[in-house]
């Protein structure tokens, strides 16, 4: 099957963004393209139409290719639950959790068979696969059990490009060192080097490129300028870098997102960040909450542990005081569960078994169970505006029920036409929802922001705006156009 492989000298070299751009470039040239990443470790996930989980980056790459996401595009997804354990998702379904030391003993053979099956299936449906590696292909201590890099390239006999981040320094050493550590048959697959994240005058780089090509015998096929991250990365640590590079001037609204230790699906906030009148700030639980226009508690892979940290740090109490004074609070997925009265984990699914007090801002009680819900949803809104179509997806293991005893039924309302997907209090101050992708829905997002604007005495913005996916299409086209002007794909398509 025809394929291209993209590997990097290090993590964060820009493999995902480059793979995304190549998918759109080739799609525009008439190829039927599919992305592929054999194994991904990420807490940003997407639910396919079949109800399977894949890395969100592979969903974006599929959209860039102009196709719907399939579980075969990311057959193995590892979702960290702690520093030493991960939940294992194979072909979209959770098969358990495992320690890092036991993972390869238990799943290596199954993992490779799954990767082979997925590649064969994709190969029958698409003209070309654009495959992304992970980390570095030259991690000596991990190479014998690497499922994602050169093992895939060799299986496909895929011409491979090596991407290096020049912005962090040491690019030439990274390229030469990586090539030196590859086996001869692996090195033979490297058909080009891409220098990524370049700032400055290109002519100053030319002597280095000439030396590198003479030293390695491999051409530099592209020098990509430094491009602002246009989509959320897979690593929550990059939220700090992303925020520090934000160039927004004074905005009308300031929204604080609590940066939980195991924050999941912070892709939920890309549409908010796209609003020119909104500033999104990610706050550590140890930071001062301040006086934002709204506070959002996001999803998390470890709801109870992150809830306990909020309580220990004082952030939970700060949010409770903020809500009591009329501030707007929104919880999404695990954040929604935290807003309730109780979270119970009788089987110790997340770790320590027990019952834990929530923030008591919404009348729900949640039980963590072993059976995960993962599905796409299409609903109609009741608030902040009646009848708006809302699309999104659920990924959660908790089951929440409304507490009836001692609760005024007029004190809360169903957020959507399915009450199980979220609540809002009678003051429309505290909001909670299980739906990821909520802000992707342009009219709903604007209606919610307009409530905040009204509280500030600001004029409402038009709600007749497109959904974020249309803006995402424009971003993907711009990304592809920029990358295509700096990248020669000829050696990979001949």
From Swiss-Prot:
Residues 252-444 form the GATase cobBQ-type domain. One of its GO terms (molecular function) is catalytic activity. The active site is at 333 (nucleophile), 436. Pfam families: CbiA, GATase_3. Gene3D superfamilies: 3.40.50.880, P-loop containing nucleotide triphosphate hydrolases. The keyword DNA damage does not apply. Keywords: Cobalamin biosynthesis, Glutamine amidotransferase. GO terms for biological process: cobalamin biosynthetic process. NCBIfam families: cobQ, PRK00784.1. Catalyzes amidations at positions B, D, E, and G on adenosylcobyrinic A,C-diamide. NH(2) groups are provided by glutamine, and one molecule of ATP is hydrogenolyzed for each amidation. This is Cobyric acid synthase. It comes from Nostoc punctiforme (strain ATCC 29133 / PCC 73102).
């Amino acid at each position: 099957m025809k394929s291209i492989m993209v590997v990097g000298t290090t993590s964060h070299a820009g493999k995902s963004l480059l793979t995304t751009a190549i998918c759109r470039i080739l799609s525009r040239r008439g190829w039927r393209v599919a992305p592929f990443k054999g194994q991904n470790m990420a807490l940003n996930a997407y639910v396919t139409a079949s109800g399977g989980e894949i890395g969100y980056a592979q969903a974006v790459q599929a959209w860039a290719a102009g196709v719907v996401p399939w579980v075969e595009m990311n057959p193995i997804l590892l979702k960290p639950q702690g520093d030493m354990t991960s939940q294992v998702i194979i072909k979209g379904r959770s098969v358990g959790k495992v320690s890092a030391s036991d993972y390869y003993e238990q799943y290596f053979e199954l993992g490779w068979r799954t990767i082979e099956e997925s590649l064969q299936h994709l190969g029958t449906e698409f003209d070309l696969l654009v495959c992304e590696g992970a980390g570095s292909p030259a991690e000596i201590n991990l190479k014998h059990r690497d499922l994602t890099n050169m093992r895939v390239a060799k299986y496909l006999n895929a011409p491979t490009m090596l991407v290096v981040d020049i912005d962090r320094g040491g690019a030439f050493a990274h390229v030469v060192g990586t090539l030196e550590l590859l086996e001869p048959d692996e090195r033979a697959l490297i058909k080009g080097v891409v220098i990524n994240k370049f700032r400055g005058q290109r002519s100053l780089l030319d002597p280095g490129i000439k030396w590198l090509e003479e030293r390695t015998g491999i051409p530099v096929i592209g020098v990509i300028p430094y491009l602002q991250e246009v989509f959320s990365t897979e690593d929550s640590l990059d939220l700090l870098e992303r925020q520090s590079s934000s160039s927004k001037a004074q905005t009308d609204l300031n929204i604080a997102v609590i940066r939980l230790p195991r924050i999941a699906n912070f892709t939920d906030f890309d549409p908010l960040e796209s609003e020119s009148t909104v500033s999104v700030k990610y706050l550590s639980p140890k930071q001062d909450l301040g006086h934002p226009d709204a506070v959002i508690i996001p999803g998390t892979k470890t709801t109870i542990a992150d809830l306990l940290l909020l309580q220990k740090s004082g952030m939970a109490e700060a949010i409770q005081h903020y809500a009591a004074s009329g501030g707007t609070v929104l919880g999404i997925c695990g954040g929604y569960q935290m807003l309730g009265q109780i979270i119970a984990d009788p089987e110790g699914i997340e770790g320590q078994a027990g019952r834990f007090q929530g923030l008591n801002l919404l009348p729900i009680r949640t039980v963590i169970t072993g059976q995960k819900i993962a599905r796409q949803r299409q609903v109609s809104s009741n608030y902040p505006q009646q009848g708006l179509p809302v699309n999104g997806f659920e990924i959660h293991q908790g089951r929440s029920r409304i507490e009836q005893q001692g609760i005024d039924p007029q004190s809360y309302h169903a957020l959507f036409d399915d009450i199980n997907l979220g609540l809002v209090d009678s003051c429309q101050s505290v909001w909670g929802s299980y739906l990821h992708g909520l802000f992707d829905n342009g009219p709903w997002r604007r209606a919610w922001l307009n409530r905040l604007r009204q509280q500030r005495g600001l004029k409402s913005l038009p709600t007749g705006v497109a959904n974020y996916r249309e803006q995402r299409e424009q971003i993907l086209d711009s990304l592809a156009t920029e990358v295509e002007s700096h990248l020669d794909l000829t050696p990979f398509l001949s």
